[in-house]
Design a protein with these regions (language model features):
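Acidic/glycine-enriched connector segments
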Residues: 1-2, 7-146
Length: 146
């Protein structure tokens, strides 16, 4: 079972406790073992930290970093605490300016669970949450703005 994260890049640190609870709930309640997170902004950093913290209790859990750009362009090693990188198939011909959104769309369409923090109406995070709501086989957990 794969869980992905979508959230605003300017998310406040006060969200961390909600993220940690959501990650643990997904491990305990849903049996999620694989988490994939982006690498742009505060929400992604907090989501990664929540999974890294959970891995101390649940060593079977893995964390991958989503690569929107082909690793051949710029080699990316998994940062400390991560287990691997993930570059979605079929992204090779996507123009760079669309790569982040396309990689996120791929994950929305191919994950089992989504943890989302998307309250800003005109944001890409919100658009991706709306896309997720139209997917038939995804369970969405929305974090509350504090």
């Amino acid at each position: 079972m794969v869980c992905f994260f979508i959230g605003h890049r300017n998310a406040d640190l006060s969200l961390m406790s909600q993220l940690e609870s959501a990650v643990k709930n997904h491990i305990y309640g849903y049996g999620v073992t694989d988490f994939i997170v982006g690498q742009y902004g505060a929400f992604d950093r907090m989501a990664a930290r929540a999974v890294i913290n959970a891995k101390k209790i649940f060593p079977e859990v893995s964390l991958s970093i989503l690569l929107p750009y082909h690793p051949y362009e710029r080699e990316v090693c998994a940062p400390e605490g991560y287990d691997s990188t993930f570059y979605p198939p079929g992204m090779e011909n996507v123009p760079r300016r669309f790569a982040i959104v396309r990689a996120n769309q791929y994950m929305i369409k191919h994950c089992d669970y989504l943890i989302a923090y998307a309250w800003q109406p005109a944001s890409n995070s919100r658009k991706l949450l709306e896309l997720a709501r139209r997917q038939p086989n995804i369970t969405i957990t929305e974090l509350v703005r504090t």
